Amino acid sequence: MEGKVYIGGEDYEKEFTPKDYLTTYYSFHSGPVAEQEIVKFSLQNLYQTFSTGGVGGDVLIDIGSGPTIYQLLSACEVFREIIVTDYTPQNLQELQKWLKKEPGAYDWSSIVQHACELEGDRSRWQEKEAKLRRTVTRVLRCDVTKTPPLGSAQVPLADCVLTFLAMECACPDIDTYRAALRRLAGLLKPGGHLVTLVTLRFQHYMVGPKKFSGVYLEKEVVEKAIQDAGCQVLKCNCVSLSYSEAYCSHDGLCFVVARKGPSA
């Protein structure tokens, strides 16, 4: 195992391997129970948010999508357009592979089936995949440490900004995290929703043999950063679920839904 700890955008661009990340954390039926339970927790909260929770609209921007699509499986039913983003070209390439059904694309079918089961019909998973592929209209580079985070790309203000397990990895310290959340709030329409999943008390995680670090966050810090970005916290679901110790050092997860104020 390598002794070096990687942190920040340039390290991700050089060292992050999407396939290693996907096989470690998203091998839904063959992987460790802890990782499966976190995917189930994520899908359940997303389903509630985008069905009975009433979050929907025209445009959703997913910030720091990584190489994953599971976080969009419920959202594609209630948004007209989804924009996916990431810092690293290799993650964007992995997303494009799946969107275009190219050879070697990651097989999400078991996770898609679980999402469909939550909606009441496991058998419509292929229809769900097709709908998501139609709904994702753009794949963009993002850097949450810069203003604007989407660079020169022209995007409409969003009804929802989603960011899952990304900000704590992209930000090396709390000040950077707080500034990044303000930038994300700037992508929202007044009254739009911010939906995020955060690993609490995060120290590092493994991608293959490589160790990546980020910012250590407590629940109170997350809530305060969201409020200071001009958003009201509507739901904060913190649980003691954690990844396998061999893969990730943290203590719990926090799923938050917030709404941007009328004048933020």
Curated annotation (Swiss-Prot):
Q: How does activity depend on pH?
A: Optimum pH is 6.3.
Q: In which tissues is it expressed?
A: Detected in lung and liver (at protein level).
EC numbers, comma separated: 2.1.1.49, 2.1.1.96
Instruction: Extract one GO molecular function annotation from the record.
Output: dimethyl selenide methyltransferase activity
Question: Record keywords: Metal-binding included?
Answer: no
Q: What is its main location?
A: cytoplasm
Q: How is its activity regulated?
A: Inhibited by the S-adenosyl-L-methionine analog sinefungin and by the product S-adenosyl-L-homocysteine.
Question: Where is this protein found?
Answer: Cytoplasm
Q: Which residues carry this modification: N6-succinyllysine?
A: 14, 97
> Could you provide one GO biological process annotation from this protein's UniProt record?
response to toxic substance
Entry superkingdom:
Eukaryota
Q: Which Gene Ontology CC terms are recorded?
A: cytosol
| PANTHER family reported in the protein's UniProt record | INDOLETHYLAMINE N-METHYLTRANSFERASE, NNMT/PNMT/TEMT FAMILY MEMBER
Of which family is this protein a member?
Belongs to the class I-like SAM-binding methyltransferase superfamily. NNMT/PNMT/TEMT family.
* Protein name, as recorded: Indolethylamine N-methyltransferase
